[in-house]
C-alpha cells in the first residue's frame, strides 16, 4: 500500500538540511512516497522571473531526490495546472495568462501561451524527476476557472452538449498515453 506524504513548499522554503531531516522523519513513520509540491522553490527556467530568491538549484534538488529515493520514498511531482497559480501569475510577465486580469490564481487554459507554458514546465519536471510512476497535475481551487468570455462560451457549449445527450455528469476526464503526457480530453 502506498503511504504518501505531501511536502508542500507553497508558503515555506526549507534548507537542504531541513528537507533531509523531514525526509528521515517521514521514512521513519512508514511513508513510502513523497508528493513534491515545489512551486517556485526550485530554479525552473520556464518560470525564471518567478523563482523564490532562496530557491534550490536543480542540482541541489536532484541530490535531495536521490537521498529521498535511498530512503525508499517514491517521488511524485505535483504541478498546479488550473488554480494555485499565484507564484507565476502574480509576476508581471505572466499577467496575460490569467483567466481574469484582476485575479492571479487561475490560468486561462484557452490561451495557447498557457498550454505552452505548462507543457514546458511539465517537461522540466519530467527531466528533473527522471523515472517516475506518477505525476500529479493539480486542478483544485481554480476559483475563476471558465470565467473569461472564451472559456465561458466553451464551458456553456459543453454543458449544452451534455444536456442534449442526457448526460448529467459534472466531472471531466483526461486520459493520457505513455508518451510523456500526450493527453486526450474526454467527458
Locate each region found by the language model.
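Domain-scale selection of a single, long terminal region
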Residues: 183-187
Amino acid at each position: 500500500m502506498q503511504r504518501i506524504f505531501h511536502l508542500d513548499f507553497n508558503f515555506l522554503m526549507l534548507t537542504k538540511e531541513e528537507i533531509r531531516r523531514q525526509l528521515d522523519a517521514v521514512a521513519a513513520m512508514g511513508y513510502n512516497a513523497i508528493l513534491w509540491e515545489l512551486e517556485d522553490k526550485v530554479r525552473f527556467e520556464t518560470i525564471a522571473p518567478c523563482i523564490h530568491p532562496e530557491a534550490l538549484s536543480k542540482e541541489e534538488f536532484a541530490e535531495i531526490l536521490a537521498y529521498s529515493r535511498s530512503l525508499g520514498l517514491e517521488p511524485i511531482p505535483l504541478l498546479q495546472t488550473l488554480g494555485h497559480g499565484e507564484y507565476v501569475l502574480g509576476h508581471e510577465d505572466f499577467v496575460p495568462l490569467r483567466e481574469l486580469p484582476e485575479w492571479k490564481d487561475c490560468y486561462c487554459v484557452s490561451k495557447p501561451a498557457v498550454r505552452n507554458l505548462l507543457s514546458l514546465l511539465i517537461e522540466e519536471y519530467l527531466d528533473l524527476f527522471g523515472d517516475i510512476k506518477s505525476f500529479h497535475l493539480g486542478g483544485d481551487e481554480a476559483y475563476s476557472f471558465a470565467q473569461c468570455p472564451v472559456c465561458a462560451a466553451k464551458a456553456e457549449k459543453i454543458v449544452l452538449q451534455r444536456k442534449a445527450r442526457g448526460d448529467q455528469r459534472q466531472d471531466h476526464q483526461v486520459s493520457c498515453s505513455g508518451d510523456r503526457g500526450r493527453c486526450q480530453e474526454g467527458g
